[in-house]
């Protein structure tokens, strides 16, 4: 029959035909997706529920003028299964995948909340940083040359060649926000700050270097889009979803994106409400380093993991990349395509513009920062300098 886009009615038919519900069951279905690329249906018969996710052959956020390969659904399904191999507690269960229809049937996580929404609403997730730090350390280590035999790693690199989605990252994270491109989207009040950003040659040179790292460093399997909208949370659970951007890339990319989105949420808050975000930023890195170190010592397969001086160099290189990638994400989410609600939903216009100017300034400072001795406190330090340094609406 070939590919066709599901509707709520045909999603129910699909689920029944594949044995997820009895033929006579009274199944309710709602399209719940709020993302930019896919349909997401929740199906429930009162006793059990599932999620059906279908990739569209174009970007939903733009329309059919932006075609995309539906093979990204297969990449997402395979990535979730690899994540589950190493950290099953932190990803949803994949029930099945239909490559022809680009349909994946996965566990319903309705008991949890999208982390971005929860943070905006002031909810607290005490285990978020522990879970994300451990998730990233395990996935990145075990899919890298340090935890995987080189021939197996090269095979995985081929599995996760993801040209359409990587091109989106190349353009929307590293290129378009730093110049005159039609995809950019920002308020007129930001024009002066944007002009200053676009004319900063030092900044552009640094961004070029980070883009080149993304293009060329095939260090480990990365999620590729790990923002707080790609995570479900509760006070006791964390589940990473939507790895359709998965590819082999730099160790520090996912960490940088995650931390940047915590910073964006911090910018939307009053000063007395920000400490929990910096707790999560610092603890994410701490849990990542501790877990990665234990795996390096106990599970390393590469000969030079036995050299004690090698690991600190690797971790410092990762941290340098985390800082720069976080800066790129801050700028992209402020003036590029696909904003975040953390900033866009600030009700007071003056405060919203001020927060966005601060995001641009902080992003520039992170990208341009150079020090071989920096530690995770850098994010708190530069943030405080930004919000107290006179960046006004």
Curated annotation (Swiss-Prot):
BP-aspect Gene Ontology terms: L-methionine salvage from methylthioadenosine
Q: In which pathway does it act?
A: Amino-acid biosynthesis; L-methionine biosynthesis via salvage pathway; S-methyl-5-thio-alpha-D-ribose 1-phosphate from S-methyl-5'-thioadenosine (hydrolase route): step 2/2
A Pfam family cross-referenced in the UniProt record is APH
Asked whether the UniProt record includes Glycosyltransferase among its keywords, one would answer no
EC number from the UniProt entry:
2.7.1.100
**Does this entry carry the keyword Signal?**
no
What keywords are annotated for this sequence in UniProt? Amino-acid biosynthesis, ATP-binding, Kinase, Methionine biosynthesis, Nucleotide-binding, Transferase
Recorded GO molecular functions are:
ATP binding; S-methyl-5-thioribose kinase activity
Family matches, as NCBIfam families: MTRK (TIGR01767)
Main role? Catalyzes the phosphorylation of methylthioribose into methylthioribose-1-phosphate.
Q: What is this protein called?
A: Methylthioribose kinase
What species is given as this protein's source?
Bacillus cereus (strain ATCC 10987 / NRS 248)
- Give the encoding gene's name: mtnK
